[in-house]
């Protein structure tokens, strides 16, 4: 075969092989990075006159990258190559001259051989055009030029790689073409042949499946008019790569593409080719088969809150199911069955066409997680003797997206984006959308007590920053749809109703009626001859949208959406249940976005019960949330009523009403939670009632700006009722943790009444740095009727008013309290006023008025004046801790034996912390100790037993405590002195340094014992031998029974260093045992010592003395021995009294007082005893 014929045959065979049409699926991409215009051009070294390497498909596919990379440029949209060397017959070029002054350095063309660089960076090009004669122009030489995309290289011998993404504007077949190739070129389209998605800058892949194969055979003519076709889907990015090699001289590569509508694009690919930075971590960047996400139905966009659809042989169904009676479950689903199209709720994260209907949302996002859950839990309690607490919760549509994009506005590059119902469409970064709903619906059946019911509904809250919501559609978008929670369309006299009902089962045989009141909310839309149509072009076979309800075209139609709630009731119960339902709403808060979706239902429930149960426990909780907007006035109120009945005719009614009015700049959120727990045990047969109630009202305020704050200190109220036929002790303790200030007043009231009594102490503080006014009123009313017919009523009211001006810098709140006690025989009124001050950036004044009234028909009332202690310090935020330890002491007298019965005191600790938030929050822990005297007057019960007959006697007593500290060893002595047989006269100063107390002397003779109460003087002596400290105490009875009791409290305050943790103060409990020869006398008392922790540590020492004119010889001595190194907390005081040993002890005490040398003899005497 001649050579020419052979070449013709090979050329024809090659043309047949390269004229291919891509019939397979082309892989597309969806890069999420920043889109850049144009393609990236990389330059690689190629050997001059190498006419074989570029003929290898492997080299053209990936082998070129093994050579030296010369450089790269980006942003190129003109892809064709047409280079000519500077010789006759070629294109005009500019020669280089050292004398030229015109600068054309941007497009140098240097007609010199490789290696001969006549034009340096400092030289310029000539302004005139010159051509070299063929004799002077070597066509086989390498010439330097910037003709190729402005990159200075040798176009005569170079390999060029062009990479980028091709974005088809329409779906269809795209035909790429090379009109001619000199020397060799290929074109690849698709993520599986050009380069991997999101990896444009990575080394080339090894695929040789070229869309256009323009490789020039060795020693053959350059191929011409080479074409390659591929099917593309609009809106996807397709990787495209062009590799061109030139071995010598001229270089030519014209690039073109024909669009599906017949439009031909040559050379300039502006708007079609783009580049993205590599992102290997992006999930679902590649779309292997875009055809799976294609849709033959085309829809036009609809406006918000309405939709219209026109389908060709399309059926849309919507179903709603309800399951009753006890467990309610509802599902919202919407499906469309169309000819030539299918729409489902399942989505693939790797597809741009994502659709969803009903209560879920759909969007195109990357790394998106969407969850939706609906649960109804309805417990059922029957045949119960106690109230049932029921809680049900509902959560719906929780969506969390990270760097996701959801939009209803589509550009020409988006093939399909849809969104439907219950969710909004916006463009946001790191946006979190959450929608939750909760239902609380109690149900109690066959119960003997009323049920406490609370219902609440919380709706979505979405906060977006710089969100954009749009529903506009570009005409180039093939499919964009949106739907919402309702629709009104065009049809003929049709009625569309969508309802949701929740029905709670019932129980018959009810002995009490249930009162039910509920508010019903519904939204209805009535159109009178209204027509809403959606224009559709003839090329639109299908327009669809889905939402909560179906979409139709109607005239004179009525659309109603209603939701009814049938609340539970109490049946077979001895009490009626009152139910009240209310409706409130809330809305989203967005920055630069408009979107409102709010539904909130709040269902408070109040109940009262009447029963004959011996014991009853009731619990009521109220939750209130208020929002104060800028320059607005908001008022709220809280009321609760609790009624209790037991088998004894005792009733208690407590009402609490408060009103808060604020006018302030800024937003203030206040959350108030109030809880009341009441326990009423059954009355014993001796008509002794013990009742306790605790009311805690923690109130926390949170301000959105640092200059506005509301602080109300919590208050704890403790009351103890002990009505009996004998004396009764009533103790009321009020404690209030501090927030802004640490100075506070503590008031304690002790009252003795014939039937019952109550004392309430409430401390509150309101501080607002900016101008405001606030008022609060609290009313407490209680009535107790015991079985003996006596009635006690208590009425107290508290008024708090506060005002503030930001002009001053000092705050002086004033607290005043008034109390009045009236009875049939005694009327006592007392008034106390205390004030404190602290420094703050604004000025506020607070007035608190507390008035209380007690009325009882019998028994005189004795009142002990309250003791108040004030501490003053200032800090911005404080955590306060309190620790209280109580101890019980008992003394017993046993005949002819010695016994010790220690009792351990109960330890109670209470720690409360509170904080105030400003620009910054600094938390300090302060420790404080309130000075308190050890002198206590209480009631004790004296049990006397004789001849197997015991009698109890209630008598008031004086508690005296003596403390001795020697070398770090502390000895504490406590004495309870009954006052029933004596008359006390209180004096203001200490008359004697000796300690005087009352003692009981038991004398036994011939089996008959007698007791005599006599005052005594306590003398204490201390001796130390071999590091052993011995303390001797002597009681000297006096002859007179008329005592003058004096007390003196010496407070010694020492400044202690600041400690981060709160200091702890404990009271030590000791047991004293008296062992006489015969007879039994036991003294029981209960003493509680409370100490507060603060920065200042106060050491309190108290001494008690009784003065008398006559002094007798000492008869009772107590001895305590402790090693010097023993800590005070481990010391246990012992006291022994006996008439038989009085002479020994008297001698020992005499020896100790006369001479220190007699200590050894005294020790021997004590050892004998």
Swiss-Prot record:
Name the segments for region: 4 X 36 AA approximate repeats, Ser/Thr-rich: 384-608
Annotated keywords: Cell wall, Glycoprotein, GPI-anchor, Lipoprotein, Membrane, Repeat, Secreted, Signal
Molecular function GO terms recorded: D-mannose binding
Question: Which residues does the record list as glycosylated?
Answer: 122, 157, 279, 389, 452, 515, 578, 656, 686, 879, 1092, 1099
Instruction: From the UniProt record, give one GO term of the biological process aspect.
Output: flocculation
Q: Source organism's superkingdom?
A: Eukaryota
Q: What is its main location?
A: secreted
Which residues lie in the propeptide? Answer: 1147-1169
Feature: compositional bias, Polar residues? 856-884, 906-916
GO cellular component terms, A-Z: cell periphery; extracellular region; fungal-type cell wall; side of membrane
Q: In what way does this protein cross or attach to the membrane?
A: Lipid-anchor; GPI-anchor
Signal peptide residues are 1-24
Q: Does the record's keyword annotation contain Iron-sulfur?
A: no
What does it do? Cell wall protein that participates directly in adhesive cell-cell interactions during yeast flocculation, a reversible, asexual and Ca(2+)-dependent process in which cells adhere to form aggregates (flocs) consisting of thousands of cells. The lectin-like protein sticks out of the cell wall of flocculent cells and selectively binds mannose residues in the cell walls of adjacent cells. Activity is inhibited by mannose, glucose, maltose and sucrose. Also involved in cell-substrate adhesion, haploid invasive growth and diploid pseudohyphae formation.
- What is written about domains in the entry's comments? The number of the intragenic tandem repeats varies between different S.cerevisiae strains. There is a linear correlation between protein size and the extend of adhesion: the more repeats, the stronger the adhesion properties and the greater the fraction of flocculating cells.
Family named by the database record: Belongs to the flocculin family.
Q: What is this protein called?
A: Flocculation protein FLO10
Please report the organism this UniProt entry assigns to the protein: Saccharomyces cerevisiae (strain ATCC 204508 / S288c) (Baker's yeast)
Q: What is the lineage of its organism?
A: Eukaryota, Fungi, Dikarya, Ascomycota, Saccharomycotina
């Amino acid at each position: 075969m001649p050579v020419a014929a052979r070449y013709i045959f090979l050329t024809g065979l090659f043309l047949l092989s390269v004229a291919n049409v891509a019939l397979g699926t082309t892989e597309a991409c969806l890069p999420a990075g920043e889109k850049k215009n144009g393609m990236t051009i990389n330059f690689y070294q190629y050997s001059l006159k190498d006419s074989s390497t570029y003929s290898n498909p492997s080299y053209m596919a990936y082998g070129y990258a093994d050579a030296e990379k010369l450089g790269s440029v980006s942003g190129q949209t003109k892809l064709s190559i047409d280079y000519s060397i500077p010789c006759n017959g070629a294109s005009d070029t500019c020669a280089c001259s050292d004398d030229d002054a015109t600068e054309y350095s941007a497009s140098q063309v240097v007609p010199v051989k490789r290696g001969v660089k006549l034009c340096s960076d400092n030289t310029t090009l000539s302004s005139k055009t010159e051509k070299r004669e063929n004799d002077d122009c070597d066509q086989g030489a390498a010439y330097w030029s910037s003709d190729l995309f402005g990159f200075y290289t040798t176009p005569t011998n170079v390999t060029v790689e062009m990479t980028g993404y091709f974005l088809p504007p329409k779906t269809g077949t795209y035909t790429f073409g090379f009109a001619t190739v000199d020397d060799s070129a290929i074109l690849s389209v698709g993520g599986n042949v050009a380069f991997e998605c999101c990896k444009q800058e990575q080394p080339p892949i090894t695929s040789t499946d070229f869309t256009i194969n323009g490789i020039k055979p060795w020693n053959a003519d350059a191929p011409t008019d080479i074409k390659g076709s591929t099917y593309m889907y609009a809106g996807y990015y397709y990787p495209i790569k062009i590799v061109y090699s030139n071995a010598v001289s001229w270089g030519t590569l014209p690039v073109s593409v024909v669009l599906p509508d017949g439009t031909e694009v040559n050379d300039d690919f502006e708007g079609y080719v783009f580049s993205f930075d590599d992102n290997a971590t992006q999930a679902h960047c590649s779309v292997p088969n875009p055809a799976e996400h294609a849709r033959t139905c085309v829809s036009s966009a609809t406006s918000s809150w309405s939709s219209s659809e026109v389908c060709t042989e399309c059926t849309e169904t919507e179903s709603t199911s309800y399951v009753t009676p006890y467990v309610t479950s509802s599902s919202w689903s919407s499906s469309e069955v169309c000819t030539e199209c299918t729409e489902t709720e399942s989505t693939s994260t790797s597809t741009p066409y994502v659709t969803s209907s009903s209560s879920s949302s759909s969007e195109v996002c990357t790394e998106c997680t969407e969850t939706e859950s609906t649960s109804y839990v309805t417990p059922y309690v029957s045949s119960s003797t106690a109230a049932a607490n029921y809680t049900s919760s509902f959560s719906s549509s929780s969506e969390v997206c990270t760097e996701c994009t959801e939009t209803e506005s589509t550009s020409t590059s988006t093939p399909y984006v849809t969104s439907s119902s219950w969710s909004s469409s916006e463009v946001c970064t790191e946006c979190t959308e959450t929608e939750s709903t909760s239902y609380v619906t109690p149900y109690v059946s066959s119960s003997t007590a009323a049920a406490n019911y609370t219902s609440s509904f919380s709706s979505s809250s979405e906060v977006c920053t710089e969100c954009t919501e749009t529903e506009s559609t570009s005409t180039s978008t093939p499919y964009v749809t949106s739907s919402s929670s309702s629709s009104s369309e065009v049809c003929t006299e049709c009625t569309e109703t969508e309802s949701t009902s929740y029905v709670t089962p019932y129980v018959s045989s009810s002995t009490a009626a249930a009162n039910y009141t509920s508010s019903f909310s519904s939204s209805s839309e009535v159109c009178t001859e209204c027509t809403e149509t959606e224009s559709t072009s003839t090329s639109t076979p299908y327009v669809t949208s889905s939402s909560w309800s179906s979409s139709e075209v109607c005239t004179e139609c009525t659309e109603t959406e209603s939701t009814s709630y049938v609340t539970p009731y109490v049946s077979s119960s001895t009490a009626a249940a009152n139910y009240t339902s209310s409706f409130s709403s809330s809305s989203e808060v967005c920055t630069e976005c408009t979107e409102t979706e709010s539904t909130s239902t709040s269902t408070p429930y109040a109940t009262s019960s009447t029963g004959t149960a011996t014991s009853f426990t009731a619990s009521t909780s109220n939750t209130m949330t208020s929002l104060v907007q800028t320059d607005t006035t908001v008022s709220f109120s809280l009321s609760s009523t609790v009624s209790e009945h037991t088998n004894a005719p005792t009733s208690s009614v407590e009402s609490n009403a408060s009103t808060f009015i604020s006018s302030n700049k800024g937003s203030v959120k206040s959350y108030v939670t109030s809880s009341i727990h009441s326990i009423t045990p059954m009355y014993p047969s001796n008509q002794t009632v013990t009742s306790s109630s605790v009311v805690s009202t923690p109130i926390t305020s949170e301000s959105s700006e640092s200059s506005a704050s509301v602080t109300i200190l919590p208050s704890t109220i403790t009351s103890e009722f002990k009505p009996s036929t004998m004396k009764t002790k009533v103790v009321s303790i009020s404690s209030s943790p501090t927030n802004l200030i640490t100075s506070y007043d503590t008031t304690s009231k002790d009252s003795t009444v014939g039937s019952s009594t109550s004392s309430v102490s409430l401390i509150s503080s309101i501080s607002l740095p900016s101008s405001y006014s606030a008022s609060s009123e609290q009313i407490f009313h209680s009535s107790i009727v015991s079985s003996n017919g006596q009635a006690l009523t208590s009425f107290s009211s508290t008024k708090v008013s506060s005002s503030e001006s930001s002009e001053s810098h000092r705050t002086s709140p004033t607290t005043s309290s008034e109390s009045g006690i009236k009875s049939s025989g005694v009327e006592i009124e007392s008034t106390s006023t205390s004030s404190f001050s602290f420094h703050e950036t604004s000025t506020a004044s607070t007035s608190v008025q507390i008035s209380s009234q007690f009325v009882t028909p019998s028994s005189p009332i004795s009142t002990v004046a309250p003791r108040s202690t004030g501490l003053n310090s200032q800090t911005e935020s404080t955590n306060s801790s309190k620790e209280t330890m109580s101890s019980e002491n008992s003394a017993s007298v046993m005949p002819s034996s010695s016994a010790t019965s220690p009792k351990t005191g109960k330890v109670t600790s209470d720690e409360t912390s509170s904080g105030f938030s400003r620009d910054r929050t600094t938390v300090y822990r302060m420790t404080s100790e309130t000075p308190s005297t050890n002198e206590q007057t209480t009631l004790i019960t004296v049990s006397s037993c004789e001849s197997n007959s015991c009698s109890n006697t209630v008598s008031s007593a004086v508690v005296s405590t003596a403390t001795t500290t020697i070398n770090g060893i502390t000895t504490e002595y406590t004495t309870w002195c009954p006052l029933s047989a004596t008359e006390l006269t209180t004096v203001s100063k200490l008359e004697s340094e000796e300690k005087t107390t009352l003692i009981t002397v038991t004398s036994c003779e011939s089996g008959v014992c007698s007791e005599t109460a006599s005052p005594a003087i306590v003398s204490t002596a201390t001796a130390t031998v071999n590091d052993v400290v011995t303390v001797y105490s002597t009681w000297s009875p006096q002859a007179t029974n008329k005592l003058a009791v004096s007390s003196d409290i010496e407070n010694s305050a020492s400044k202690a260093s600041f400690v981060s943790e709160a200091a702890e103060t404990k009271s030590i409990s000791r047991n004293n045992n008296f062992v006489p020869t015969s007879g039994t006398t036991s003294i029981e008392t209960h003493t509680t010592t409370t100490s507060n922790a603060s920065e200042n540590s106060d050491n309190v020492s108290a001494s008690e003395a009784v003065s008398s004119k006559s002094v007798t010889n000492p008869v009772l001595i107590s001895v305590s021995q402790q090693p010097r190194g023993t800590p005070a907390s481990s010391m246990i005081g012992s006291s022994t009294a006996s008439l038989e040993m009085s002479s020994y002890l008297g001698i020992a005490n005499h020896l100790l007082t006369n001479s220190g040398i007699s200590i050894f003899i005294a020790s021997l005497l004590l050892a004998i005893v």
